[in-house]
Amino acid sequence: MDPAWDGSQGSRPGTASIRVRELSWQGLNNPQPQNKRLGSHGDIYRERRVEEHLSPARLQALAQVDDLQLVRVLEMCVDTRKNSLGNFGMHLPNLIQLKLNHSCLGSLRDLGTSLGQLQVLWLARCGLTDLDGIGSFLALKELYVSYNNISDLSPLCLLEQLEVLDLEGNNVEDLGQMRYLQLCPRLTTLTLEGNLVCLKPDPGPSNKAPQDYNYRAEVKKLIPQLHILDEVPTTCTNLPAPQKLSQDWLMVKEAIKEGNVLDILLPRLECSHGATIRKFDPTLPVPETQPWALSLLVPEGPLPEGLLSENPAAEDHASNLTHGPGQVLCGNPTKGLRERRNQYQEWAPLEQLPPHRPDLAIRPSTLRPDPAESCDLSMTGLRAWREPGLRPLLQRQLEFQQERLTHVQAQDPQKAPIEQEDQTGPKTSLTPLRLASELSRTSGFHLIPSPPKYPMPPESGISSLGRSADLPFRGRRLRVLGSLGPSLGEGSVLGERLALRALEVSSDPSHRAQGCPDPKPSLGPATCPLGLHCLHHLNPIPPAHPFP
């Protein structure tokens, strides 16, 4: 800015690079946001995301006191990788005991340098690899750092007031590290169990201790002021020492170091006097639960055997949609799952499908019936058409086929019958018998036909021959029945053709399977209902001769 320029001279020259514009509005230009008072635990959790350190308000909420000078004991679980503790010790001038078990600490320097009056410190299972920064706690008398990864004890030489030291389950391998503890004149209690120094004096490839090595006697020589070693008086130096560190013990040691989840989920057996236990950054992982048994989810009773795999232990780690680990799904997964579903519906046993009509008598069977059961299927189709509940569905199918045929004929009246015969084939006849059998096949169940009024002998190998021989006789009876009664009118001929058609299909199913053309063209859908009314007048035909 030009220092010689005065505002009274007019506007600033065009060389100015900064312009200031005042806002003409009432009130403060930069109002401060209103602070929200800490209330419930939900507010504490929400504001914890904003605050980057332990503020006095948060310490008051943790200790449940208004005056932080009254706090002497504080226990919390922190994670310095996510939240910084700051210099919280300056707000707790009278803090004597601090318990941070199961926390995640990168270093002791994360605790700050304002805890000079602290006397007892718990840091069990905190993931510590060293003790750098312990010199800030000059008044420390008891230090519990069990089950960490500490191997260097040199920072402890600055603690002249130290009396109790717990190093259980650490990585102290060199007996020479005990020399640093000589500089702690008041050290009386030491715990070294679980360190490699208890087996051998020096680190090496072998995990076997020398025959004449006694770590209790060696530690007593290096730390003469020590009174208790591993909860046993140091005067007892003849205790048998373990000669080999087994792999099971190492596994248990590592499990204890990483067993914070178990301690968090289990209830506390004891609580120190003072501040209530609070967790600054609780991360409670939900334990993995085993899936409930299928029998517990179905209150009706046990499940069918078809729903359960033969070997459930071999497929408990794989989803049913991924075909297990033995097969690889390539290409479009949606298309593959759709094809798999269609294939499963075609080949799966019907025990796995739910009942479609509970009011009808049904029996499960395979989706591909044997040729020997074709007669039962034909009679079942006729009975299914006579069921009142199934008529609307068949009627809709007939209307759909009629609309489709009308649309094709409107486009090309000459080629429509030929194209439909080529596309659908002989299996897509528009007779109600074929539609009824198709309905029973798509629904997955076959209706149980009504029992015959006359006893029939069991089917044998010559059953198909008997049906073929009996076909002319039944045809004559049907023609006679179709000609009786003036009420039938023109529908008698159609009823005769439909009945004969059903008998031909039931007697010789291989005739249509071989692709032979029908002797007569298929009837149109518009004339099908008239023929079906004629079938209501059919009565059971008594056998001409008694069976042997």
From Swiss-Prot:
LRR repeat boundaries on the chain: 94-115, 117-138, 139-160, 161-182, 186-206
Keywords (A to Z) from UniProt: Cell projection, Cilium, Cilium biogenesis/degradation, Leucine-rich repeat, Repeat
Domain LRRCT, chain residue ranges per copy: 207-249
Family, similarity comment: Belongs to the LRRC56 family.
The protein's role, per its UniProt record: Required for the assembly of dynein arms.
Pfam short name (any one): LRR_4
Matches recorded under SUPFAM superfamilies: L domain-like
Protein known as: Leucine-rich repeat-containing protein 56
InterPro entries: Leu-rich_rpt, Leu-rich_rpt_4, LRR_dom_sf, LRRC56
